């Protein structure tokens, strides 16, 4: 799988589900990842966990991201994922949420290189699919290169590097100089990630760091246009921002996709956060938000969107 020159959607737990990923594909994202999936849950054949692996053909190239620490469990989970035929398998080495790290998962694996190697090799040796890793810079910024080289030596095909240390969550600035240094010291493709808020920043950071590709996460929330905008900026030196009409229309299509035209009531709750993201900054949006947060009626939601569009 060639990731050079490509833009990917970062995996975000509870957000980048199959519906959002498909919307991003409409606007040119090159490849996507599943949400964070527990290897332990796959090992136990948890139905809830396996639901997170669902994807559609239009999302390809698509990777399933897992987290875990036990080599045997990771190997078992990987063999089960092989049957689902994703395009690649990704190992999460970047999640710094306390409850994840406390159990030794995510960025906690970056503390002990021996355990890290065992975990990565267990996945690589259990599949013919490309294996990637999404990593942070470790617990010390100077360890980033060493970690990346370990992953390369273990047979990882490419890495996505978030430019923060494991303890910083999203505080401070993403260190793209360290990402650049990693790129200069490994032979596998490196994808840069962190603090890309605008197409201009995406292009600037991409060019300055010399990474092979970029990954966009939080900046895509309510703004799937950003992938097309980056590509337009590269190709034409300019891009267009969506009008209110376009924002409402894509949100409407997102609702239809996620709720199956209102049949999947449970997904109406999930869509509330997307409503807020898509329409952030719209005039008089507060009263519409209050209505959206109260209703589970699909027809009413469509009527609210129509009113927002007309009032714009």
Descriptions of predicted regions:
Residues 1-312:
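Flavin-dependent oxidoreductase catalytic cores
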């Amino acid at each position: 799988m060639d990731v050079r020159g490509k833009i990917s959607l970062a995996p975000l737990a509870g957000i980048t589900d199959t519906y959002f990923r498909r919307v991003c594909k409409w606007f040119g994202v090159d490849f996507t990842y599943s949400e964070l999936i527990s290897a332990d849950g796959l090992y136990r054949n948890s139905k809830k966990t396996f639901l997170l692996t669902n994807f559609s053909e239009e999302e390809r190239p698509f990777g399933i991201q897992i987290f875990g620490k036990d080599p045997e469990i990771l190997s078992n989970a990987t063999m089960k994922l092989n049957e689902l035929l994703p395009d690649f398998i990704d190992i999460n080495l970047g999640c710094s949420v306390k409850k994840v790290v406390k159990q030794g998962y995510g960025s906690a694996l970056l503390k002990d290189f021996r355990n890290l190697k065992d975990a990565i090799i267990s996945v690589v040796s259990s599949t013919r699919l490309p294996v990637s890793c999404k990593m942070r810079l470790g617990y010390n910024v100077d360890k980033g290169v060493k970690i990346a080289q370990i992953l390369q030596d273990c047979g990882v095909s490419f890495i996505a590097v978030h430019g923060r240390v494991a303890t910083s969550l999203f505080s401070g600035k993403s260190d793209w100089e360290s990402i650049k240094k990693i790129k200069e010291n490994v032979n596998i493709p490196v994808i840069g990630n962190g603090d890309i808020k605008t197409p201009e920043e995406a292009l600037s950071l991409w060019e300055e760091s010399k990474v092979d590709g970029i990954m966009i996460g939080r900046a895509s929330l309510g703004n799937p246009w950003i992938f097309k905008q980056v590509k337009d900026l590269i190709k034409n030196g300019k891009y267009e921002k969506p009008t209110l009409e376009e924002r409402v229309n894509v949100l409407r299509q997102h609702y239809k996709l996620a709720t199956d035209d209102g049949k999947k009531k449970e997904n109406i709750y999930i869509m509330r956060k997307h409503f807020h993201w898509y329409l952030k900054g719209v005039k008089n949006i507060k009263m519409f938000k209050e209505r959206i947060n109260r209703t589970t009626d699909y027809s009413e939601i469509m009527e609210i969107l129509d009113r927002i569009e007309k009032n714009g």
